[in-house]
């Protein structure tokens, strides 16, 4: 399935039905009073978060959503039917903005979360409401009110426990394919991963966490170089960053510093997230390789996804980090 993480749509709630002009017509009551019913309300438009959805692809093909119009009022004080509501499913992690104002309307985070995005118009009153002592046979009724109408911009930010960060060919796709059932494209050239991939990593005792493979960052990504900020935003919602540097990198410390700099330029708050560093591709490490000391308080592990080296220790540490975040996100945000 094609991955799409931004889309624009228009939504239109239903107009309210018009009120009815009607008079009682019964045997022996030749001049009955007004009995026009009210119009039904227009249908509302809702957004509903659905964890089964992973892309905004559907909105590339359908860009307009219109709820049903309210039914018109009838005689004998019968109200028109309410218009049919429209419920639009979106992936968890979708941020919705009003195109005209730029205002963020909602952030759809929880599965099943639902919000009314456009309210249907109120139905008009029938002529029964306008009878008075001096006007006993009103020959008018209210029209229905128009439903709300908006242009919306949607942006998907993937929700994962662990975000993989590294230059192209750091081994991110290989790692996620080994630890989970995800099957990203893997090849020995830069930018093999062109879209984010999500994988569920199974841990002991039926525990699991979600890992996101973000397309490779290059220097200048925050300014739009390479794949640019198109996918950097997907790191924002991750709880823990797993920064990956290959063992055969000429200057591991410099590459690590560059990755942190790109994250900081995009969003300084990313550096407050817990992070773990892994030196990858240990199966092809130089003979004189030594483990680097990169930053005080940041753990560094060595792995080889191909040889299976260090993967158990990595899963243990990632689970520890994710568990801390799940227990007390605010307390451990900078740990």
Curated annotation (Swiss-Prot):
Occurrences of domain Obg (ranges): 1-159
UniProt subcellular location: Cytoplasm
Question: Can you tell me which residues bind GTP?
Answer: 166-173, 191-195, 213-216, 280-283, 304-306
> Keyword ATP-binding on this protein?
no
EC numbers for this chain: 3.6.5.-
Tell me the GO BP annotations in alphabetical order. Answer: ribosome biogenesis
| Highest taxon of the lineage | Bacteria
Q: Which UniProt keywords apply?
A: Cytoplasm, GTP-binding, Hydrolase, Magnesium, Metal-binding, Nucleotide-binding
Q: Which HAMAP family match?
A: GTPase_Obg
Q: Which family does it belong to?
A: Belongs to the TRAFAC class OBG-HflX-like GTPase superfamily. OBG GTPase family.
State what this protein does: An essential GTPase which binds GTP, GDP and possibly (p)ppGpp with moderate affinity, with high nucleotide exchange rates and a fairly low GTP hydrolysis rate. Plays a role in control of the cell cycle, stress response, ribosome biogenesis and in those bacteria that undergo differentiation, in morphogenesis control.
| Annotated organism of origin | Chlorobaculum tepidum (strain ATCC 49652 / DSM 12025 / NBRC 103806 / TLS)
Q: Which GO terms describe its molecular function?
A: GTP binding; GTPase activity; magnesium ion binding
PROSITE patterns named among the record's database cross-references:
G_OBG, GTP1_OBG, OBG
Instruction: Tell me the subunit arrangement.
Output: Monomer.
List of residues binding Mg(2+)? 173, 193
Database matches in Pfam families: GTP1_OBG, MMR_HSR1
Q: Which cofactor does it need?
A: Mg(2+)
* Gene name of the record: obg
What are the OBG-type G domain coordinates in residue numbering?
160-323
Q: Which GO terms describe its cellular component?
A: cytoplasm
**The protein, known as:** GTPase Obg
């Amino acid at each position: 399935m094609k991955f799409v993480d931004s889309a624009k749509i228009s939504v239109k709630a239903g107009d309210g039905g018009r009120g009815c002009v009607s008079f009682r017509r019964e045997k022996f009551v030749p001049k009955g009073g007004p009995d026009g019913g009210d119009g039904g309300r227009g249908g509302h438009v809702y957004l509903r978060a659905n964890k089964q959805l992973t892309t905004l692809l559907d909105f590339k093909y359908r860009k307009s959503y219109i709820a049903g119009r309210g039914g018109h009022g009838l005689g004998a004080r019968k109200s028109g039917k309410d218009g049919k509501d429209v419920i639009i499913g979106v992936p968890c992690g979708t941020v919705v903005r009003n195109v005209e104002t730029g205002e963020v309307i909602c952030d759809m985070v929880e599965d099943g979360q639902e919000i009314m995005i456009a309210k249907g118009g109120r139905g008009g009153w029938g002529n029964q409401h306008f009878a008075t002592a001096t006007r006993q046979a009103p020959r008018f009724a209210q029209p229905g009110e128009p439903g709300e109408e908006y242009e919306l911009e949607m942006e998907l930010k993937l929700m994962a426990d662990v975000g993989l960060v590294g230059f192209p060919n750091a081994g991110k796709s290989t790692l996620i394919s080994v630890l989970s059932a995800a099957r990203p494209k893997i090849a020995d050239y830069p930018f093999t991963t062109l879209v984010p991939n999500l994988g569920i990593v199974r841990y002991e005792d039926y525990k699991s966490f979600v890992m996101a493979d973000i397309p490779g960052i290059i220097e200048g990504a925050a300014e739009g170089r390479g794949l640019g900020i198109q996918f950097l935003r997907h790191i924002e919602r991750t709880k823990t960053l797993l920064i990956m540097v290959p063992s055969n990198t000429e200057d591991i410390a410099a590459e690590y510093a560059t990755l942190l700099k790109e994250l900081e330029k995009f969003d300084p708050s990313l550096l407050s997230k817990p992070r773990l560093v892994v030196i990858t591709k240990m199966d092809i490490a130089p003979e004189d390789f030594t483990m680097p000391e990169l930053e005080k308080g940041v753990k560094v592990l060595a792995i080889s996804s191909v040889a299976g080296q260090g993967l158990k220790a990595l899963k243990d540490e990632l689970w520890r980090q994710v568990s801390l975040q799940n227990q007390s996100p605010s307390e451990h945000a900078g740990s």
